[in-house]
């Protein structure tokens, strides 16, 4: 195991390894996962983050007691460099364990194993071909690869396996690309390239999107797929291994595998949906309204979308027990005050909701909050009311905390349900169930982070 040492002096050329292990992750309250935007790992569907890797990581981070930050890597050639630089803590991207990768990274126990298969497309006029012609076209053995061109991602485990075949004397033409595996599979389906290689689970899933594809021979069998991390994170590795050992034997793990790798027709509809970050470019049917109204308050429209996802799950007809209605869950009195005649009308509801947000933001102008803190204080105020958040701020200041930093104020919001604190002389509005507003802010910020990652 490599050790973590002090940074190099300017005279030293070698870069010391980045160090961030389990204790650092728990102290920061966040695990940063490097992943790819793919149908197997991670994507957004109808405003919700989903994917096999995401589902596992979400449960693992819950076990650790930390939040999850998904970092989507556009070019997987750089994923190991990003890990090495400390831009993430773990690689979770349907990542094969190979001898070359093991020399640089630590891997967990295998999550599952998969063959690597050749992906090819059925040619137009297949039904008119004779049996002999079909047999000549189909790749049924390694020898059928002689003289064929196979395109794979540069630096991938597929490239390593093809090189092994080439070193065995099989004259394969290998074309390297910086495209993702799923992009290359699509290119095979579209006739842009002849062949590619994919993990069998990924190939079979993509075959539901492109019916003209088949997975032919395996060029490598039962290759393990796992999470990868820096050698300088032994405690994280041990924790992940212990968790995987237990979780892989549960019904929950079997259900996740079924959802993403076996119930392919259902998964296909999600991936190809216009409300998928893979198949389309929409978060919800109301994106145009979000884009228009968010400009009034200087917000990223995806932040407004994240807020509506939390408020109503994009359901314009929903009504709470307290009588709050529509996309932004406004009380009729609030809606009327901000000009909404019908809260079931999405345009009116969003317009009134944004006007309400603007009024809340004005209440915080005198505090000179930075942009991110203004967003968080505004979200909390929208949920719990400005008065209770002002109480939490005053309480934080009374105990020596920074009243303009949400991370320092939020613990005192949680204390407003305790008599010792809500009876404090600086607290004007008494009891508040602060956990609701605290979780509200975290959830909206979490959705916003996913939307910014998944949609470019």
Where are the language model's segments positioned?
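Extracytoplasmic small-molecule ligand-binding "clamshell" domains
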Residues: 4-103, 173-178, 183-186, 240
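Extended ligand-binding regions for polar small-molecule ligands
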Residues: 8-16, 22-23, 54-63, 120-157, ...
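Bilobed "Venus flytrap"/periplasmic-binding protein-like clamshell domains
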Residues: 32-41, 46-62, 113, 117-179, ...
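Periplasmic-binding protein-like
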Residues: 37, 110-127, 200, 204-242, ...
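A ligand-binding cleft/hinge motif common to bilobed small-molecule-binding domains
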Residues: 77, 81, 93-104, 163-165, ...
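Export/targeting segments at the very N-terminus of extracytoplasmic proteins
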Residues: 264-313, 347, 364-368, 456
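Substrate-binding/active-site groove segments that recognize
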Residues: 317-341, 348-359, 444
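Catalytic and substrate-binding regions of cell-wall glycan-acting enzymes that process beta-1,4-linked
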Residues: 378-451
């Amino acid at each position: 195991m490599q050790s973590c040492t002090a940074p190099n002096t300017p005279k030293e050329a070698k870069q010391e390894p980045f160090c961030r292990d389990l204790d650092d992750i728990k102290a920061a309250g966040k695990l940063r996962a490097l992943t790819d935007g793919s149908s197997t790992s991670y994507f957004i569907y109808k405003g919700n983050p989903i994917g096999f890797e995401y589902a596992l990581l979400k449960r693992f981070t819950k076990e650790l007691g930390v939040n999850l930050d998904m970092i989507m890597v556009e070019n997987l050639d750089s994923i190991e460099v990003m890990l090495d630089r400390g831009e993430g803590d773990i690689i979770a991207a349907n990542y094969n364990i190979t001898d070359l990768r093991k020399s640089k990274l630590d891997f967990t126990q295998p999550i599952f194993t998969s063959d690597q298969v050749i992906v090819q497309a059925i040619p137009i006029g297949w039904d008119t071909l004779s049996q002999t012609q079909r047999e000549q076209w189909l790749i049924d053995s390694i020898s059928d690869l002689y003289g064929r061109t196979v395109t794979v991602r540069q630096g991938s485990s597929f490239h390593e396996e093809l090189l092994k075949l080439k070193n065995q004397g099989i004259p394969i033409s290998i074309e390297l690309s910086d495209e993702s595996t799923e992009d290359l599979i699509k290119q095979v389906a579209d006739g842009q390239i002849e062949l590619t290689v994919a993990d069998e689970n990924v190939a079979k899933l993509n075959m539901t999107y492109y019916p003209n594809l088949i997975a032919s021979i395996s060029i490598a069998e039962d290759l393990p797929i796992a999470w990868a991390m820096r050698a300088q994170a032994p405690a994280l590795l041990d924790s992940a291994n212990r968790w995987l050992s237990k979780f892989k034997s549960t019904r929950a793990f079997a259900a996740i595998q079924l959802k993403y790798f076996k119930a392919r027709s259902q998964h296909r509809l999600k991936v190809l949906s216009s409300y998928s970050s893979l198949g389309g470019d929409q978060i919800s049917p109301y994106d145009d309204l979000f884009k228009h109204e968010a400009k009034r308050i200087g917000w990223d429209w995806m932040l407004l979308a994240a807020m509506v996802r939390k408020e109503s799950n994009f359901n314009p007809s929903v009504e709470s027990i307290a009588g709050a209605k529509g996309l932004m869950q406004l009380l009729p009195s609030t809606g009327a005050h901000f000009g909404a005649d019908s809260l079931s009308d999405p345009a009116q509801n969003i317009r009134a909701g944004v006007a309400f947000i603007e009024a809340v933001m004005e209440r915080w102008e005198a505090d000179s909050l930075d942009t991110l803190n203004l967003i968080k204080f505004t979200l909390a105020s929208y949920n719990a009311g400005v008065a209770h958040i002002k109480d939490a701020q005053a309480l934080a200041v009374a105990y020596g905390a920074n009243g303009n930093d949400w991370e320092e104020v939020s613990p005192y919001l949680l204390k407003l349900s305790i008599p010792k604190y809500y009876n404090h002389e600086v607290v004007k509005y008494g009891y508040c169930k602060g956990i609701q507003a605290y979780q509200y802010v975290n959830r909206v910020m979490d959705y916003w982070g996913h939307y910014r990652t998944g949609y470019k």
